[in-house]
Amino acid sequence: MSTRTFLEVEAKFAVVDTAVVPDLTRLAGVEAIASTKTHRMSAIYYDTTDLRLTRSRITLRRREGGDDDGWHLKLPAVAGRLEVHADLGEPVDGLYQVPEEILSQVRALVRREELQPIAQVDNERVESVLADAEGRPLAEFCDDHVSAWSLLPGGSPSSGREWEIELAGDTPGTEQGENILHSATQLFISAGARVSSSPAKLVMALGDSAHQAPLPPFLVDADVDPDSPAAAVVAALKLNRDKLHEYDPKVRRDEWDSVHQMRVATRELRSHMETFNGILGGEELEYIESELKLLASMLGYARDAEVVEERFLRLLDSEDSDVLDETTRGHLREDMGTEYRRAHRRVIATLNSDRYLDLLDAIDSLLADPPVVGAHAAGPGTPEKVDEADDTEQPAADLPAGDEAEAGEPVAEVAPEEEAAETVAPQPQTAEEVEAILSEHLEEAYQRLMKRHRKAVENWENPELTLHQREDYFHDMRKSAKKLRYAAEAVGAATSLKTKRLYNACKQMQSSLGDFQDFRFARCSSRQWFVSDCGIHGRLVHRLKRRDRGFGNISHF
């Protein structure tokens, strides 16, 4: 079953039953009412028993009537809401099943929980299409008379009237669209309406019955001293966990830069666990760190393929001679995208696996009941051992469809004498003591970066090392810079310590070294693909046949 995705930008207003719709041609840019229709619609809304979709500002409904029968999933977006539509499909044993294409978009939240009806909303809608002077649709105005029922325990019926204006055509995200919504707000309020306190009809339908539902695991607050270092660490981990939830559906939709951002969130989450080792600890933490490393590896494989493709395409576009015709260029672009598409399919298989869902459950459990070490907050624990653990992201053999993927991030081994025993300090009570403990962990992260910096610089011209080994030292340095950057952000958010300059400096260093690493990976990958018989070089030879000049021109990539 296919889906359709678009951005919904609208404004809602509550009105009394006797309110009169004002002259809609008074809205900015509106010259005519192109058409008016009446629809009778009925929608069933679905969620888990703990309302994890509703609490995340996500609505899922199956609606009949109107011009868009089917399943509608609405997700938060930067401007407005992202709508995903799917056809109704055929019922199974008399019941309609949520399409997999829709369910996959919320799997990171729903996981193994059953989606069940939570409300019914019936709506008699008078819909008017508002057009400009050329007849182009600008917006749709809906006059809705709503009857709703909560299907939750303690639910009751409700009813009301609502005006809704939704931008249409090319107006969402434009200044013209903003002007339409602004003028609509002024016009409707002057006609007796008020901005709706319910952003969705579902909220009105559920009413007070929503408060009786249990909290989902990711909303359970940890029972820790709010002034302790543990509370600061948990707050930082929650932000990263929420980013995983945010980018999961974006990766599934293959939105631009989503793989990269989900990988960053995964690494930052794990980095915090390692940097603040000694404040939190235990086997569950170690399990999560290990699983996050595997997830980052799968995402890294796709990200690396994406980087190589982007760099190659830029080089291809800069080749402005007539040696390569458009057909050949098209073949090369297709070839370069194949590796990323293959890697992305492996990522999706990973996100659909039980192992990934187990990881999400484990993270929620840890944040709800954090394993504070010995009921204390400690000073730095085993920095070198922890730091080196982040340097290889090797996927496990039982990860679905991606067991051969490797992140390609080697690192030098750690001498046993570098490992330090974990220490435990009494639970602090003052802000100064909290800052002292967190700053100690920050200092350890800084010293790890300095050690790697010295190692990279001192060995850059070492004739006993290969170029690959010398470059690895700079890559290790970059990873330490990222750890320090993440730690600086977390400590700055939790204390009065001024870490912004440190954060920005680490970000700049990470960016420069990241460009170096991307170029390095692209260089190695391109060389491998070009020289292989089944790679680009071999396919290019086959396609160009006797065009030796063209082949020679391409080979410099």
Predicted segments, located by residue:
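Cationic, histidine-enriched alpha-helical/coil surfaces that engage anionic ligands
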Residues: M1-F557
